[in-house]
Amino acid sequence: MARYTGPATRKSRRLRVDLVGGDANFERRPYPPGQAGRARIKESEYLLQLQEKQKARFTYGIMEKQFRRYYAEAHRRPGKTGDNLMVLLESRLDNVVYRAGLARTRRQARQLVSHGHFTVNGKKVNVPSFQVSQYDIIDVREKSRKMVWFDEAQEALADAVVPAWLQVVPSTLRILVHQLPERAQIEVPIQEQLIVEFYSK
């Protein structure tokens, strides 16, 4: 599946949000490319909604067609569509690996999952979009644990801040999904109601 692989900082500046996490270049220049020193142009309601959708897509590394499927599923489920959408995005396996501190970025987490380094409930899963469920157990495969990266990740877990809905066992690199996240537990600068308004037109 094709994905945006261009300069992450440029995309972050255009959408005014750090899509990478800890991007020093974005912190220095948080305004859109080509707008240095210019007053912000008043944006239309449609443009704001579109930007919010793009922000969510690029934050989680999802193409438009797949994102539409997420929205359709969120709309089908009971409850608030926006909340459901954010829970679906946050429950992707690659995002869980990132949230647990086993990858520096979601892009790296996606690569680690795609290369088959993880199991879910004892079964190998190499699909980044795999939806985790409550009580799932995610492990690094035995042969993968010998990789230098996982040695470094294991050391870094001592300082990792893990969301309350997850638990990480540093000694085994095991991730426990105690529950699916609630919207209040998802710390991303996305106004999902604007996305709902975008697709409701």
From Swiss-Prot:
Q: Where is the S4 RNA-binding domain?
A: 91-151
A GO molecular function held by the record: rRNA binding
Write out the GO cellular component annotations: small ribosomal subunit
The residues the entry assigns to the signal sequence are none
Looking at the record's lineage, which domain of life comes first? Bacteria
Which InterPro entries does the UniProt entry name for this protein? Answer: Ribosomal_uS4, Ribosomal_uS4_bac-type, Ribosomal_uS4_CS, Ribosomal_uS4_N, S4_RNA-bd, S4_RNA-bd_sf
Q: What are the alphabetically sorted keywords of the record? A: Ribonucleoprotein, Ribosomal protein, RNA-binding, rRNA-binding
UniProt record, GO biological process: ribosomal small subunit biogenesis; translation
Detail the disulphide connectivity of this chain as listed in its UniProt entry: none
Q: Does the keyword Ribonucleoprotein apply?
A: yes
Q: Could you tell me what this protein does?
A: One of the primary rRNA binding proteins, it binds directly to 16S rRNA where it nucleates assembly of the body of the 30S subunit. With S5 and S12 plays an important role in translational accuracy.
Q: Describe its assembly.
A: Part of the 30S ribosomal subunit. Contacts protein S5. The interaction surface between S4 and S5 is involved in control of translational fidelity.
- Family statement: Belongs to the universal ribosomal protein uS4 family.
Protein name, please? Small ribosomal subunit protein uS4
